[in-house]
């Protein structure tokens, strides 16, 4: 960056820029925001705007690019979406009155995690996450600056931190400690996050809570410090810090949520085809956000679940009232976002009108809720604050046709302020007064073509042609002489003109001041508005779930304390919605008190994965308080769901399908309890047949003997069905098929017992493979099955506790010699779960050299 012969204005730019080296600096110059030097070059490319230069004839011209101030937000949005920060430097004084260089200051730093304004607003949350580490546990705080939501928790390990960040769909993570290189790679390269750093803790006594740990306080404090530092103002809309525990909700990793298509379809990354899409009959942006939160965090408290169920049942029983409620909610705007705009000093007249319109709807919503005449609904009614005084203020103060910008005028209603009304009367009637003066002077002077004109230089004046100069009255005074005419004024005309100019200037200034005063008054109601927003959002989600339940004929699930799963004629709610009720084939699912594992076999495409997902979605819907897709459901309360459904290599981190499978299996068996649900689909596919089968059997046995979680394990290893003879809590089920005249029909119904065939060649036939290829595959299969029966090479008997090896004690794999001890130490030092395939190969090579 060349800095020779820098002008005072450019020196000001450089002085400001050095404080924001990691951000694009938008430097306000008149009607444009300008960028210079490297910022200009990079922005021109990213924003597809013209790149020019300042002082083009200089030896080192300065690269320059700019965007109009009135459309700057759309360009800021692009930079933020690409993961950059933007610092906005405004002119702090009127350039016309400035002495020397116009004073400029950065008024806001916009980052991916602190977006409030956007040219394309999104109803979804935008969370900024802060993480701190005390050497033992992690503190994680998050905030949506646009709504004021502010929460904190503590977590045991980095895996939990990563999962929570993914669940929050954060775009920016604020760190108060140094990450390891591997952790940084995960966050930046795999999760595509912007990492920011903050060392200072915001000093705020209101943050101190005896229930918070030190690491939670520092995470929350650094988050607050960063937000105040970037937003550069007091944020009155920030809500009280809420402490939460992961264990208070049904725990699911991001991978689990993704495989179950909870908030978006994993194949399309769109909302359509997800559980969120199915359940969303909300009418407000606040309700949409809350519904997503409920899906993300189902409850584990039976009391809280039943409370939601009860309200949904009340709504279901009153169609007319519920319809009125839904229609009334359509008139509710995003109170949370409107409150934040007020807090940021960015709320315009349209924003206040939306807020006023919302408040006008609240009494109707409250009356409808009261009409349900239900104690559980009355709790919601009692939480609704109508704020009639604020609604009255907005209704009487803001003109219903007010523009979106403050500078255009016509904001304040007539009758709200006497002075403003007077000025408007002067402006409105002034033209009539001038017309009266013109008519009077024309008649008295005898100048038939006498008229009053106006221009910026001379103001209002009488236009008199040269032929009529002899008729000019004595009280006229000359203002200007032209070639064929002269311009005159009078004391009376000057007085009227002065009144009109004063009225125009004072009206504009007064109207602005009145609006600022009203906005300041609205800000004092923010806490009450946020409480109202939460209640209306809850009402919206509950009516949405009632509408979905009625439309799709869902039933109210029951809960038990004896670890029994009973689902009669259950359906995969999303698949049913996509396919249609007539096409979908329901399935019952049953786990008695004794059964902990269902081993499911059957061909591909027969419905095994759908059966597993059906159970998971039923549990999630039930524990979020929703009704479910079945004829009858009775469930235990689960504390976590672990899944491995579907295969996809993690190419970015260099992890294969098999490695990802093993990592997810490890997380499940380490974290699951006997109150958890485990769903494993075809575990062990990514390695050799015997290796995969051995691992699958060992995992099943481990879950059976040590974990005790309710588990569905889908497999193509038919040999594993023999485990039912040894494992007392395992039962076999299979997907039924119908064979007739060489054709196979998949019935998509689950039946007891193991499958007798896998029908893989039939699936290949459906896929359209050549007949000659299928014939050859059938020949090979026949030969392999014959060999298997004769040599029993495929037989992998389950572990038998009474075997001689167990009775005699397991022999040591390593022995007692020094070389074996060295190999053992090397193996124990390996962090298998965090190795890439390349690292694993390298380590194996090094171990081989020790032999």
UniProtKB/Swiss-Prot annotation:
Annotated GO MF terms: ATP binding; ATP-dependent DNA damage sensor activity; damaged DNA binding; mismatched DNA binding
InterPro entries linked: DNA_mismatch_repair_MutS (IPR005748), DNA_mismatch_repair_MutS-lik_N (IPR007695), DNA_mismatch_repair_MutS/MSH (IPR017261), DNA_mismatch_repair_MutS_C (IPR000432), DNA_mismatch_repair_MutS_clamp (IPR007861), DNA_mismatch_repair_MutS_core (IPR007696), DNA_mismatch_repair_MutS_N (IPR016151), DNA_mismatch_repair_MutS_sf (IPR036187)
Short name of any one Pfam family annotated for the protein: MutS_II
UniProt keyword annotation of NAD present: no
GO biological process, one term: mismatch repair
NCBIfam families named among the record's database cross-references: mutS1 (TIGR01070), PRK05399.1 (NF003810)
Family membership: Belongs to the DNA mismatch repair MutS family.
Protein purpose: This protein is involved in the repair of mismatches in DNA. It is possible that it carries out the mismatch recognition step. This protein has a weak ATPase activity.
Protein name (record): DNA mismatch repair protein MutS
Gene name of the record: mutS
């Amino acid at each position: 960056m060349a800095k020779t012969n820098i002008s005072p204005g450019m020196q000001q730019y450089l002085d400001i820029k050095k404080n924001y080296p990691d951000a694009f600096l938008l430097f306000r110059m008149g009607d444009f925001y300008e960028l210079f030097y490297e910022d200009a070059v990079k922005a021109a490319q990213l924003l597809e705007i013209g790149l020019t230069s300042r002082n083009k004839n200089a030896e080192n011209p300065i690269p320059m690019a700019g965007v109009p101030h009135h459309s700057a937000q759309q360009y800021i949005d692009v930079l933020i979406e690409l993961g950059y920060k933007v610092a906005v430097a405004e002119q702090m004084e009127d350039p016309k009155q400035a002495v020397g260089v116009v004073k400029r200051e950065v008024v806001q730093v916009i980052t991916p995690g602190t977006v409030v304004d956007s040219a394309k607003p999104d109803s979804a949350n935008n969370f900024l996450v802060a993480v701190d580490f005390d050497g033992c546990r992690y503190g994680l705080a998050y905030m949506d600056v646009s709504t004021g939501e502010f929460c904190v928790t503590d977590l045991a390990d980095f895996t939990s931190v990563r999962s929570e960040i993914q669940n929050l769909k954060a775009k920016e993570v604020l760190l108060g400690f140094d990450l390891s290189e591997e952790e940084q790679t995960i966050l930046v390269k795999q999760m595509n996050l912007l990492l920011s750093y903050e060392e200072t803790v915001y000093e705020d006594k209101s943050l101190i809570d005896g229930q918070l740990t030190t690491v939670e306080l520092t995470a929350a404090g650094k988050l607050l410090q960063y937000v105040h530092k970037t937003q550069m103002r007091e944020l009155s809309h920030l809500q009280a810090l809420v402490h939460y525990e992961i264990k208070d909700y049904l725990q699911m990793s991001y991978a689990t949520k993704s495989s179950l298509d909870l908030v978006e379809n994993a194949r399309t990354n769109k909302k359509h085809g997800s559980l969120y899409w199915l359940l969303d009959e909300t009418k407000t942006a606040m309700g949409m956000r809350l519904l997503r939160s409920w899906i993300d965090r189902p409850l584990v408290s039976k009391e809280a679940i039943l409370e939601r169920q009860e309200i949904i049942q009340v709504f279901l029983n009153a169609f007319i009232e519920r319809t009125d409620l839904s229609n009334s909610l359509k008139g509710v705007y995003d109170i949370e976002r409107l409150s934040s705009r007020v807090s940021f000093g960015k709320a315009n007249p349209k924003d206040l009108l939306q807020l006023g319109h919302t408040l006008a709807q609240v009494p109707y919503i409250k009356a409808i809720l009261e009409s349900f005449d239900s104690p559980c609904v009355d709790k919601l009614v009692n939480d609704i604050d109508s704020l009639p005084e604020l609604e009255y203020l907005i209704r009487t103060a803001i003109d219903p046709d007010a523009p979106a910008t403050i500078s255009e005028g016509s904001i304040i209603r007539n009758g709200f302020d006497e002075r403003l009304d007077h000025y408007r009367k002067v402006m409105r009637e002034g033209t009539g007064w001038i017309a009266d003066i013109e008519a009077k002077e024309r008649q008295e002077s005898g100048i038939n073509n006498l008229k009053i004109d106006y221009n910026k230089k001379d103001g209002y004046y009488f236009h008199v042609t040269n032929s009529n100069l002899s008729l000019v009255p004595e009280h006229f005074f000359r203002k200007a002489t032209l070639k064929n005419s002269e311009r005159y004024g009078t004391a009376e005309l000057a007085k009227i003109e002065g009144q009109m100019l004063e009225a125009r200037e004072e009206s504009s200034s007064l109207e602005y001041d009145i609006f600022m005063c009203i906005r300041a008054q609205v800000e004092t109601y923010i806490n009450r508005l946020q409480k109202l927003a939460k209640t209306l959002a809850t009402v919206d989600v509950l009516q949405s779930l009632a509408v979905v339940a009625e439309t799709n004929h869902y039933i109210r699930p029951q809960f038990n304390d004896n670890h029994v799963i009973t689902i009669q004629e259950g359906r995969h709610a999303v698949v049913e919605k996509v396919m249609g009720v007539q096409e979908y084939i329901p399935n019952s699912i049953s786990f008695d008190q004794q059964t902990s594992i269902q081993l499911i076999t059957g061909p591909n495409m027969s419905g095994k994965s759908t059966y597993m997902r059906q159970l998971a979605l039923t549990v999630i819907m039930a524990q979020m308080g929703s009704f479910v897709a079945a004829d009858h459901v009775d469930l235990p309360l689960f504390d976590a769901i672990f899944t491995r459904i579907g295969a996809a290599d993690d190419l970015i981190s260099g992890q294969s399908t098999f490695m990802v499978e093993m990592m997810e299996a490890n997380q499940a068996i380490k974290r699951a309890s006997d109150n958890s649900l485990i769903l494993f689909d075809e575990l062990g596919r990514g390695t050799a047949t015997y290796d995969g089968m051995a691992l699958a059997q060992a995992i099943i046995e481990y879950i059976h003997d040590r974990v005790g979680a309710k588990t569905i394990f889908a497999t193509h290893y038919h040999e594993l069905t023999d485990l039912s003879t040894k494992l007392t809590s395992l039962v076999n089920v299979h997907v039924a098929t119908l064979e007739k005249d060489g054709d196979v029909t998949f019935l998509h119904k689950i039946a007891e017992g193991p499958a007798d065939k896998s029908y893989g060649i039939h699936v290949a036939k459906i896929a359209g493979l050549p007949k000659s290829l299928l014939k050859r595959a059938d020949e090979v299969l026949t030969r392999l099955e014959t060999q298997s029966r004769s040599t029993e090479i495929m037989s992998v008997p389950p572990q038998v506790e009474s075997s001689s090896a167990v009775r005699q004690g397991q022999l040591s794999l390593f022995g007692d010699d020094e070389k074996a001890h060295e190999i053992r130490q090397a193996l124990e030092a390996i962090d298998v779960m965090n190795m890439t395939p390349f690292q694993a190969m390298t380590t194996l090579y090094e171990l081989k050299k020790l032999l």
